[in-house]
Regions:
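Short loop/turn elements that form and flank the Walker-type P-loop nucleotide-binding site
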Residues: 64-66, 77, 136-138, 175-179
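Pre-Walker A (pre-P-loop) alpha-helix and adjacent loop at the N terminus of AAA/AAA+ ATPase modules
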Residues: 7-74
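Conserved, well-folded catalytic cores of nucleic-acid-processing
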Residues: 21-25, 61-65, 89-93, 117-121, ...
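Conserved C-terminal "switch" segment of AAA+ ATPases
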Residues: 8-32, 209-297, 334
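C-terminal engagement/docking regions of AAA+ P-loop ATPases
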Residues: 76, 81, 283-491, 495-516, ...
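Canonical AAA+ ATPase core
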Residues: 69, 90, 121-124, 141, ...
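Short glycine-rich substrate-engagement loop in P-loop NTPases that contacts/grips substrate
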Residues: 106-137
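Walker A/P-loop
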Residues: 60, 64-105
Length: 574
């Protein structure tokens, strides 16, 4: 039997051990810290935990599936060394292997040196183009040193990897299923190229690397000289985790719950930075706050965000805010993500992806520091979000089909000074005030409270076929979420039983034969969706002892599948 709770706790302890070991052995010395605010449910109050900023954020990046991170700072700050050591500890790869897979950015770096080369023997003998992929492409732990020295063409190759998980060379295409990527950047370096906004947007998080303080330098100088002795891979930089273990951590991180207000708050961050009363910032080429767009505008005040930002924030930013918040909440062993956790991580997720109005950015006390200015922006967003709280409550009542008589009047008052209420909340509430919407919303609510899965499934099927129903997407999602909550079941088994599981499921559900077979065939995470069943599989590795997670949710067939899996003695139900 597999003790999944003990396994999760053991994995978390190993991650903390990595942080402690790097600090204790002085493998990376930097005194700058990050304050993490979180709500302690036991003591019923908000607490603060102090963590080493650079090291902790680099570790968080490894806990997020298929993640990419930018380390921004001058040369000699230990950026590349740190991620090499983390690669050794998190994957068990030798330092020499990690070194061989590093891409060193420079303008002469060709596509062949970055991605792969043709097998010359086959090409000359048979005329066949067979690609031998570079270790950077095939390896799990990827490092790009000085990414801003890559030409725009080389950046496009990496963009394909980050955006689609695919790399192309000649007519060959390889899929990069799972990876963790780190890129270093020295903004002051000569001979560099500008990184495009779409390219920067693919990096989920970034951290500024400042030079060590006097005390840090003292510790560094009195410590061991790695140039002379090297690193002891058994004691100083031991293997603590493996790729299989990291895949298991990804599964646990993805399952982290988050409060409803976190959903609203992340929306607020994105929309505060994107909305404008005059133009669509995403499609406006010349009109920007920095070019005089905000002159004479009613919303051009110190308490607004829109007049301080030239660019927009993409949907990817919203997803990354949640991903990294989940990773941080999991690492701190919290039950769920709250707004405090999002606030702690937001400056590092946003700062490298946004273009601020220079006049605002260069004011005291920021002096051009995008990270500090982003923290200031998040503080404003936070205040405005809590001032707007009654409007979210009104929107919830409209969603549930039970609005109050004066709710629209209240929203109209807020809309005079709040762009989110004016362009998002108020139009939404007006759109769903129809009687047929309220009637169906109340029906869904009753089905939820009574646990009537059949009724929920019927409502969902009706909505799928009715393209004109107001706020249809929300109601379908509501049904899906409630079906998920009432039927979700998690199972764990060893990879040695993957064929048995496949046969059992395929025998009872022939339509799942091929999808299940493919999902369990290699290390990967897959979702399989039928009309009323959602299956998520997570194969951490293909060794006999590797752990496989499978989650079932949906309607009547999901319950039938759950009963089948519960009857298998080699499966552990969580």
């Amino acid at each position: 039997m597999i003790n999944t709770q003990g396994e999760e706790g053991s994995l978390r302890k190993k991650v903390w051990n990595t942080i402690n070991l790097i600090q204790a052995n002085q493998l990376f010395v930097h005194s700058k810290n990050i304050e993490i605010k979180y709500f302690d449910e036991v003591k019923n109050k908000t607490n603060i935990k102090i963590l080493p900023e650079i090291l902790s954020l680099c570790v968080l990046n490894a806990l997020v599936p298929n993640s990419a991170m930018l380390l921004v700072g001058g040369h000699g700050g230990g950026k590349t060394t740190l991620v090499k050591l983390l690669g050794r500890m998190f994957t068990g790869m030798r330092l020499e292997e990690i070194e061989n897979s590093i891409v060193r950015g420079h303008p002469q770096l060709t596509e062949e040196k970055l991605t792969g080369t043709l097998k010359l023997g086959k090409l000359m003998k048979d005329g066949t183009e067979e690609v031998v992929w570079r270790q950077f492409v095939t390896g799990f732990w990827k490092i790009i040193d000085e990414v801003n020295r890559l030409t725009p063409y080389s950046q496009d190759i990496l963009l394909s990897l980050l955006a689609e998980g695919k790399v192309k060379y000649y007519d060959a295409i390889t899929t990069v299923e799972k990876y963790t990527l780190y890129s270093t950047i020295n903004p002051q370096d000569v001979g560099t190229f500008e990184l495009s906004q779409p390219f920067l947007d693919r990096f989920g998080i970034s951290v500024p690397i400042s030079m060590p303080s006097s005390n840090d330098l003292s510790l560094i100088l009195t410590g061991k000289d790695e140039k002379y002795t090297g690193y002891d891979e058994l004691i100083e930089v031991p293997k603590i985790l493996s790729i299989d273990a990291l895949m298991e951590i990804w599964y646990y991180v993805n399952r982290m719950r988050f409060k409803t207000e976190v959903n609203n708050y992340i929306h607020a961050i994105i929309r505060e930075c994107t909305l404008c009363a005059r133009v669509d910032k995403g499609n406006s080429e010349n009109l920007r706050p920095s070019s005089g767009l905000c002159s004479g505008c009613h919303f051009n005040t110190d308490i607004n965000i829109c007049n301080k930002i030239d660019s927009i924030l993409s949907v990817r930013v919203a997803k990354d805010l949640l991903r990294y918040s989940k990773a941080l909440a999991w690492l701190m062993d919290l039950n769920e993500v709250d707004v405090n956790i999002v606030n702690s991580i937001a400056p590092y997720v946003i700062s490298h992806r946004v273009n601020y109005r220079e006049r605002e950015l260069e004011k005291a006390p920021f002096w051009g520091n995008k990270y500090e200015f982003t923290k200031h922006i998040i503080e404003i967003v936070n205040k405005r979000y809590f001032n707007r709280k009654p409007c979210y409550d009104i929107a919830t009542r409209f969603r549930d089909g039970v609005p109050n008589e004066k709710d629209l009047d209240t929203l109209s008052d807020y809309a005079k000074n709040d762009l989110i209420v004016k362009y998002d909340i108020l139009p939404f509430c007006k759109a769903v005030k129809a009687k047929k919407y309220a009637k169906l919303a109340v029906k869904i609510d009753k089905s939820v409270k009574s646990g009537d899965l059949t009724s929920l499934t019927q409502v969902r099927d009706t909505l799928i076929n009715d393209l004109e129903f107001p706020n249809r997407a929300y109601l379908i999602n509501w049904c899906d979420q409630e079906l998920y909550k009432q039927t979700v079941s998690d199972f764990t088994f060893k990879y040695s039983h993957q064929k048995d599981v496949w046969v059992e499921i395929a025998t009872e559900f022939p339509n799942l034969d091929q999808p299940i077979k493919e999902a369990l065939s290699k290390r990967q995470t897959k979702q399989i969706r039928t009309e009323d069943v959602l299956i998520e599989t997570n194969v951490t590795g293909t060794d006999e002892s590797s752990i496989v997670n499978i989650q079932i949710s949906g309607g009547a067939n999901a319950l039938k599948l759950r009963s089948l899996l519960e009857s298998l003695e080699y499966l552990e139900k969580e």
